């Protein structure tokens, strides 16, 4: 089974992405990984850190001459600001008799962080793990970790492209209380136009409304969340399964998206709006003509019974406002219990555009895993052969002899 993990801290020496059980022969380039990481840094309302957060890439294992080997793949993303953090984030014990260490750890970025931010992992993490310094929590809980997920997903993107010819895209539906995008569904041909938008919007009216929201929040010393949508065209019927809850593809996608920092809700297709409809208005009727099976609607978002049904996969995720609010929120000091305001780290007003790219990454990884679960293969060519056989069987199954015109 395809498996991915990440390691590293926000201000540590590096982040590591590991991908296991990817078939041999999948093309991967540093340029493509760098391109996807750059997309993650996009967005109106990003903080100053994005100017520093360049991504120094190293392919450590599992790739030779631009192709995967079938062995574990590990990708390292170096921290270009590491020289500023070598003492503070040192993995070795510090000699606190050394005046330089004392100075580094007693003020500025090295000072102990004892005022947990409401909405962040600080408070629960300090208590759960017995830490007296919130840095031990926030370094790993930071959304900087998602850079490693995007790197891992770039390998999965190539796998999906090579095996199924599909691409994964996202766009921002709304930010804060902006007017949500309502209009034609974008296709992958629109991805450059979406990325060229400062808020990754597909529609100028929605873009203007989102930018206005961000400007207002910035002036008010506040932060914003929003809604992103991920779209995937061309998936075959039958990825996932109805057999058990954990095998349902919608459950896997929802879990992966909810695992992104600050994501608070997920809906497939029309999602919660479906709950307001009657059954006769909620489901996508099936028709057959000379060109094959078709539907006039896609309210299910491409998933029925935990399986892809051949329609476009459509998923939305809701991101809460960033927890590091410039006008710091009320909290308590964990050192003495006194009333305080939350610690302030360099952060963004709005990271919703970037969240769309991360959501793409997680959907990509889940889909790649589903493809390998369904079709297997130790090499790319073997997986493609298995897919071709399956698709031919589906095509044969859907040929109906003696069907009268209009039947």
UniProtKB/Swiss-Prot annotation:
Please state what the protein is called: Chorismate synthase
Report the sequence similarity comment from the record: Belongs to the chorismate synthase family.
Role this protein plays: This reaction introduces a second double bond into the aromatic ring system.
The record's keywords, sorted A to Z, are: Amino-acid biosynthesis, Aromatic amino acid biosynthesis, FAD, Flavoprotein, FMN, Lyase, NADP
Question: Which Gene3D superfamilies does the record associate with it?
Answer: Chorismate synthase AroC
Has the keyword Amino-acid biosynthesis been applied to this entry?
yes
Catalytic activity annotation = 5-O-(1-carboxyvinyl)-3-phosphoshikimate = chorismate + phosphate
Organism, scientific name: Corynebacterium glutamicum (strain R)
**Residues that coordinate or bind NADP(+):** 40, 46
Give the cofactor note text. Reduced FMN (FMNH(2)).
């Amino acid at each position: 089974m395809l498996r991915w993990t990440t390691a590293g801290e926000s201000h540590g020496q590096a982040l590591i992405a590991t991908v296991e059980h990817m078939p041999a022969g999948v093309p991967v380039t540093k340029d493509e990984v760098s391109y996807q990481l750059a997309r993650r840094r996009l967005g109106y309302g990003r903080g100053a850190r994005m100017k520093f957060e360049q991504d120094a890439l190293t392919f450590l294992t599992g790739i030779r001459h631009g192709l995967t080997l079938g062995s574990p793949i590990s990708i390292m993303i170096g921290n270009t600001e590491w020289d500023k953090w070598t003492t503070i984030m040192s993995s070795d014990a510090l000699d606190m008799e050394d005046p330089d260490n004392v100075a580094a750890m007693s003020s500025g970025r090295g000072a102990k962080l004892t005022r947990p931010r409401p909405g962040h992992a600080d408070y629960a993490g300090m208590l759960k793990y017995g830490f007296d310094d919130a840095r031990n929590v926030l370094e790993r809980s930071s959304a900087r970790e998602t850079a490693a997920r995007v790197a891992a997903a770039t390998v999965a993107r190539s796998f999906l492209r090579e095996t199924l010819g599909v691409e994964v895209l996202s766009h921002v539906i709304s930010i804060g209380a902006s007017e949500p995008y309502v209009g034609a569904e974008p296709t992958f041909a629109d991805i450059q136009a979406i990325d060229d938008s400062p808020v990754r919007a597909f529609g100028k009216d929605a873009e203007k409304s989102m930018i206005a929201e961000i400007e207002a929040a910035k002036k008010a010393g506040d932060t914003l969340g929003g809604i992103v949508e991920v779209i995937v065209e061309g998936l075959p019927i039958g990825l996932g399964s109805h057999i058990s809850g954990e095998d349902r593809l919608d459950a896997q996608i929802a879990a992966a998206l909810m695992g992104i920092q600050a994501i608070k809700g997920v809906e497939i297709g029309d999602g919660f709006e479906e709950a307001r409809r009657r059954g006769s208005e909620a489901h996508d009727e099936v028709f057959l003509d000379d060109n094959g099976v078709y539907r006039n609607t896609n309210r299910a978002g491409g998933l029925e019974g935990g399986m892809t049904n051949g329609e476009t996969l459509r998923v939305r995720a809701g991101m809460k406002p960033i927890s590091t609010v410039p006008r710091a929120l009320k909290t308590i000091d964990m050192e003495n219990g006194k009333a305080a305001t939350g610690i302030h780290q360099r952060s963004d007003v709005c990271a919703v555009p970037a969240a769309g790219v991360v959501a793409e990454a997680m959907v990509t990884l889940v889909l790649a895993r589903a493809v390998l679960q369904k079709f297997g293969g130790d090499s790319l060519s073997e997986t493609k052969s298995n897919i071709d056989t399956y698709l031919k069987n589906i095509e044969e199954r859907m040929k109906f002899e003696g069907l009268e015109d209009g039947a």
